[in-house]
């Protein structure tokens, strides 16, 4: 094993949050070496899985993300046009866009940032990180995809931007023969069309009323209207549809309410007074699971379904093994500071997080608590807490 690489920080993950952290660290630590660890360096899950998804973020906010720190602006100004940035400027700024535009923007920023001599790029996964508390130093072990050797990096700061994946719950009816559809597949029309058989009647159970659930319904309805005329959908939901509302200078249900294409589809076709008469209503049967009716509803309706897709949120991806002075460490995230504490409530030195796995907790003027997920929301959070991380 070669000698450990010494750096000012280690950033794990190269999705939108990891990229934002790298940009902020390069801006605030000029001349310092920053280690960046990721298996792909291809803009994370948003690029791998969600390129065909319509965003619930306005184009102008993607632009604000891309110009938020000087290292990003330098990349934009030195990238030959046409490029992902110039393409973004031609879109309608006050509307959403398909996420492939945002993913390509992140890939272009990543490509430019990786050219910096101040970035130590390591293509692989972190397997273990141990804090030497008296030295305030993390020793980070990395399984490199580019060499057979384990790589080690030593740094006073370890920032986890490790992402999340769709939540999987147990099938509500035991021993039921039903095929799971991955939410990521249902959100990708080009893949969904191949995932469901066309030659016989098929019924897909969609669980949830989130933004992802509504987009899943939209994609399945589009399929039923075109290539899969025998497809039907049973929509299991406990909650009324909830929409983001633009208030005076802020957004009610900014992180939990429907926006954009999903909101338009829901308002026009899925509301209780619209569904029976709408185009979507030709294919969708809504199953009310509210007020304790959930178990009975599943038992009555799920056995007639051939497939099930659960759109019930996202679960943090597994973290690398963490230790302090060789002893296993259980880390609890602080959604205010971006730091972590141990099982006894003690602050863990130099350990931080951001992104969908570790979002900021926000409270709106009506005292509603939400967790801020989105490109520019990650950037705002990181810009707020990064000075504190570097001063600690």
From Swiss-Prot:
Record keyword Oxidoreductase present: yes
The signal peptide annotation in the UniProt record is 1-20
Which terms are listed as keywords in the entry?
Glycoprotein, Oxidoreductase, Signal
Supply the source organism for this entry. Paecilomyces divaricatus
SUPFAM superfamilies registered for this protein in UniProt: FAD/NAD(P)-binding domain (SSF51905)
Going by the entry's taxonomy, the superkingdom of the source organism is recorded as Eukaryota
Q: Which Gene3D superfamilies match?
A: FAD/NAD(P)-binding domain (3.50.50.60)
Q: Which PANTHER family match?
A: FAD_NAD(P)-BINDING DOMAIN-CONTAINING PROTEIN (PTHR38688:SF1), PYR_REDOX_2 DOMAIN-CONTAINING PROTEIN (PTHR38688)
The GO molecular function terms of this record are:
oxidoreductase activity
Record's protein name:
Monooxygenase AgnR1
The gene for this chain is AgnR1
Q: Which InterPro entries match?
A: Agnestin_monoxygenase, FAD/NAD-bd_sf
The annotated consequence of gene deletion is: Does not affect the production of agnestins.
């Amino acid at each position: 094993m070669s000698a450990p690489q010494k750096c000012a920080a280690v950033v794990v993950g190269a999705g939108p949050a990891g990229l934002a952290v790298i940009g902020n660290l390069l801006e605030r630590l000029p001349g310092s070496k920053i280690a960046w660890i990721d298996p792909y360096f291809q803009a994370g899950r948003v690029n791998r899985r969600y390129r065909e998804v319509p965003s619930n973020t306005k184009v102008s906010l993607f632009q604000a993300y891309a110009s938020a720190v000087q290292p990003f602006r330098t990349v934009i100004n030195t990238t030959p046009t046409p490029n992902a940035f110039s393409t973004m400027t031609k879109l309608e700024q006050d509307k959403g866009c398909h996420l492939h535009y945002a993913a390509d923007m992140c890939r272009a920023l990543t490509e430019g940032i990786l050219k910096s001599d101040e970035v130590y790029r390591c293509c692989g996964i972190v397997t273990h990180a141990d804090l030497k508390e008296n030295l305030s130093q993390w020793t980070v072990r990395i399984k490199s995809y580019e060499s057979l050797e384990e790589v080690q990096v030593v740094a006073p700061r370890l920032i986890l931007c490790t992402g999340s994946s769709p939540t999987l719950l147990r099938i509500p009816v035991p021993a039921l023969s039903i095929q799971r559809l991955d939410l990521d597949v249902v959100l990708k029309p080009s893949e969904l069309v191949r995932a469901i058989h066309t030659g016989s009647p098929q019924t897909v159970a969609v669980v949830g009323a989130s933004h992802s659930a509504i987009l899943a319904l939209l994609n399945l309805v589009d399929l039923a209207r075109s290539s899969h005329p025998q497809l039907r959908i049973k929509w299991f939901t406990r909650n009324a549809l909830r929409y983001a509302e633009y208030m005076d200078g802020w957004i009610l249900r900014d992180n939990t309410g429907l926006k954009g294409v999903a909101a338009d589809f829901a308002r026009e076709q899925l509301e209780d007074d619209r569904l029976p008469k709408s185009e979507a209503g030709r294919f969708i049967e809504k199953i009310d699971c509210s007020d304790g009716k959930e178990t009975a509803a599943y038992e009555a309706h799920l056995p007639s379904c051939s497939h099930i897709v659960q759109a019930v949120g996202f679960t943090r991806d597994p973290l690398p093994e963490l230790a302090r002075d060789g002893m296993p460490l259980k880390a609890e995230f602080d959604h205010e500071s971006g730091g972590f504490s141990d099982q006894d409530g003690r602050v863990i030195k130099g350990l931080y997080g951001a992104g969908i796995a570790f979002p900021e907790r926000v409270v709106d003027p009506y005292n509603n608590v939400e967790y801020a997920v989105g490109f520019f929301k990650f950037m705002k959070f990181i810009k707020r807490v990064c000075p504190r991380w570097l001063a600690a």
